[in-house]
Regions:
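Residue-level recognition of tetratricopeptide repeat
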Residues: 6, 46, 79, 83-86, ...
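Structural motif corresponding to the intra-repeat A-B loop/turn of tetratricopeptide repeats
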Residues: 11, 31, 51, 71, ...
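Amphipathic alpha-helical segments of tetratricopeptide repeats
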Residues: 23-33, 62-73, 102-110
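Terminal, low-structured helical/coil segments at or just beyond the last alpha-helical repeat
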Residues: 105-128
């Protein structure tokens, strides 16, 4: 189901992508596979964000973040924090998410991703 969700996201059919990602989440919750569940929460959040449904995207990112933190999936935690920094409306909260993402990526030595997040921080500072 996650593969179908990814396919529909690529062809910009957000409704079908959301349907398949949601189905994949249901299956994964029964199988106790937290890593895949975090990834699907992130993918579902991205589809919702692409569809302009930022608040719903944020909810899925927060669900994924809770799972990532509980299982010490640090790279996924950084990704989710960065994505929360992209969809959050409140400027100070956006900065907080992005700063936390920067810290995680710095600890992991993920320099390319760190630069991307620094660009996001710059956009927030400049008011974009």
């Amino acid at each position: 189901r996650a593969v179908l969700g990814r396919y529909y996201a690529k062809i910009k059919d957000n409704d079908l992508a959301m349907l398949h990602y949601s189905g994949a989440l249901e299956i994964l919750s029964e199988q106790a596979d937290p890593h895949s569940a975090v990834e699907v929460e992130m993918l579902l959040g991205q589809v919702l964000s692409d569809a302009g449904r930022k608040e719903e995207a944020s909810e899925h990112y927060l669900e994924g973040l809770a799972l990532a933190e509980a299982n010490d999936f640090r790279h996924l935690k950084g990704e989710l924090l960065a994505r929360l920094g992209e969809v959050e409306k409140d400027r100070s909260q956006r900065m907080e998410y992005l700063q936390k993402a920067l810290s995680v990526f710095r600890e992991l030595g993920a320099n390319d991703r760190m630069r991307e997040v620094q660009n996001s921080v710059h956009r927030v500072v400049m008011g974009h």
